[in-house]
Amino acid sequence: MPTVREVTYDLFRKHGMTRMFGNPGSTELPMLQDFPDDFEYVLGLQEAAVVGMADGHAQVTGRPALVNLHTAPGLGNAVGALFNAQANHSPVVVTVGNQTRSLMTVQANLTNRDAVRVPDPFVKYTYEPPRAEDVPLAIAHAIHLATLPPCGPVMISIPMDDWDVEMDASDAAHIINRNVSGRATADPASVVDLSERIKAAKNPIAVAGPDIDAAGAWEEMVALSENQNLGVWACPAPGGGRLGFPESHPHWRGVLPPAIGPVSQTLEGHDLILVVGMSVFPYYPNLAGPLLPEGAELVQITSDPDEAARAPMGDAIVADVKLTLAALLEQLDGTKREAPPAWPGPTRMEDSDTISGSVVCSILKEHLPEDAIIVLESPSSTLALRNQLRISKPNSYFFGCGGGLGFGLSAAVGIQIAEPDRPVVCVLGEGSVQYAVTAFWTAAAYNVPVTFLILRNEEYAILKWFAEIEQVTGSPGLDLPALETARIAAGYGIESRTAGTADEVDKELAEALADSKPRLVEVPVQPGMNLF
């Protein structure tokens, strides 16, 4: 009869999960024993970075990513990254070792005595099977839930003496060979009703969210915009983990502000607001105002029942975004409304003695290959990068929706591993780097050729901006003097350069993007926010 270990690896094969991101400990060694030749193990040096790599990998591939962590300490280290993965709707499947069953009652060293509670509420499913024979079924349960809409992370805790237990081969075959599909179609009546509301609207507008990209629905979203001459705003930056619409398209309106009052003010004059593939709305900070402009109605299309249920206003259709947009297009045959005026191009940036993050982003635009992927975690330069780059291909932009720092650096490594033929550029603030700095080692050790662009402003600029908005004065801990990321990365094996002028940035970026190894370019930039 097959062992639990053998069945589990066959289950992973069935789901295409033959790459494992991990940081092993003694409680995981029995699972990793005789590691299969057709599997790849990607070692990370700290668990938050491990989960971040898997998060990026899962998003860019659209498939579940496998993680293995070390009992309670390792899972604890990873919780912040699981929070990000949940916000990103990433199907990350986490296996965690535990002490042997015979020693759990006495709480021997490394016992995760309440394993299922540690990651809750940041996972869709968390479980420790009562019997060794139940491990493959529990993992299958987790995989199916992780990949059903809305996708999200899951965790299974497995005592270390379960792996050599034998189980029934027939039961194993049933577990392995199951298929579960979950793309829900919208109620036809609700689609017809929405189409009539769009036709009747005098000045409708759309807001495109990250799940358009995850669902592969760019083509349908562009077609809807062009069919009905809809302007399209991008999701507010805090929730804009992916792009749902090409930002070079003349119908693109820009990035919505992230607070209640400014959102309503920005959307004034529109009588119908169609929100696709996102929550309503990812607000932050708290700036009061009306939820909607006067006279406006809102309709949301989302695959996430919770996003629909928690929205404070408007109606919602819960269904697959791509299928729903396709069904909606069948009900529409053009419009007599005039097309919205073309959105202005990128703001021209002027040079100065100390260059700004905006200038660096404009230089990056000149070197960026057409098929490049951008991973961003520079909070003070997010809007500047979006404005300058105008990314216009699907599956090409990733940002941590959860707001927990550490996503960018680690996710970029996981994305580049998944997409070896596409250049990946990771734009980071030097503060963000520190939350997943060990991912530099993985990039160097596995020759993952990410170009890391570090904008060094020696402060938490976004926090100073929030302090102004919140009228908070005298807060400590907002400055980061003398933090030299280039030297840190070099210690992990990354070839690193510092560029202090626009000409130097131009030269170093050109060389980095042409290299087949990971490279880092650190640029000292002006303090403050970069909005354009």
Where do the language-model regions lie?
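N-terminal alpha/beta PP-like core and its mobile active-site loop of ThDP/TPP-dependent enzymes
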Residues: M1-L332, E370, T442, P449-F452, ...
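Short, small-residue-rich loop/turn micro-motifs
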Residues: P24-G25, V96, M160, P236, ...
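Thiamine diphosphate
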Residues: T95, L103-T111, P258, S264-L267, ...
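Short glycine/proline- and acidic residue-enriched helix-loop micro-motifs
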Residues: P121-Y125, I176-R178, P340-D353, Y492
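A structural motif corresponding to the C-terminal end of an alpha-helix
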Residues: F122, I363-A372, A489-I494
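Phosphate/pyrophosphate-binding active-site segments
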Residues: E133, D171, G295-T382, G500-F532
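Conserved short loop/turn motifs at secondary-structure junctions
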Residues: G209-D213, M349, G429
